[in-house]
């Protein structure tokens, strides 16, 4: 019993040393508000399919920050326009007028050398 009473007295001392804050007064008008604005989030219904190590298919759906989503969209639009422009250049045929006159001259000299 004496041991139980000593444990109780120790816990009572700890409670006495840690008083609870019981301030019911409203916050003052000049107190600093350290809260930050809430970031807007968007729910994406699109699933990202990932194959797990165990062979199960996992679809991730969920929330994404609006600013991150908009940044990714701008980035994808930018890269899509770059890819489209580079494809046009790569698939375009070279016009004969675009050829260098020196290259044409060398080709003619090479053909003339083969004929003689």
Swiss-Prot record:
Q: Which keywords label this protein? A: Nucleus
| One GO process term, biological-process aspect | DNA damage response
User: For the region Disordered, what residue ranges are annotated?
Assistant: 1-40, 70-116
Additional remarks:
Present with 538 molecules/cell in log phase SD medium.
Give the UniProt entry's GO cellular component terms. Ino80 complex; nucleus
| Compartments where located | Nucleus
Low complexity compositional bias: what residue ranges? 1-15
Q: Which domain of life is it from?
A: Eukaryota
**Basic and acidic residues: bias regions:** 84-108
Fill in the subunit field for this protein: Component of the chromatin-remodeling INO80 complex, at least composed of ARP4, ARP5, ARP8, RVB1, RVB2, TAF14, NHP10, IES1, IES3, IES4, IES6, ACT1, IES2, IES5 and INO80.
What's this protein's name?
A: Ino eighty subunit 4
| Keyword Nucleus applies | yes
Q: Could you confirm whether the keyword Methyltransferase appears in this record?
A: no
The protein's organism comes out as: Saccharomyces cerevisiae (strain ATCC 204508 / S288c)
Record gene name: IES4
């Amino acid at each position: 019993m004496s041991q139980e009473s000593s444990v109780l007295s120790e816990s009572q001392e700890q409670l006495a040393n840690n008083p609870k804050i019981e301030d019911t007064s409203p916050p003052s008008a000049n107190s600093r508000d350290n809260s930050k604005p809430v970031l807007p989030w968007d729910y994406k219904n699109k699933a990202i399919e990932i194959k797990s190590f165990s062979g199960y298919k996992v679809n991730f759906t969920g929330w994404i920050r609006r600013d991150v989503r908009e940044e990714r969209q701008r980035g994808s639009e930018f890269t899509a326009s770059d890819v489209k422009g580079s494809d046009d250049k790569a698939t375009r045929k070279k016009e004969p007028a675009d050829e260098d006159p020196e290259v044409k001259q060398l080709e003619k000299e090479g053909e003339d050398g083969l004929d003689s």
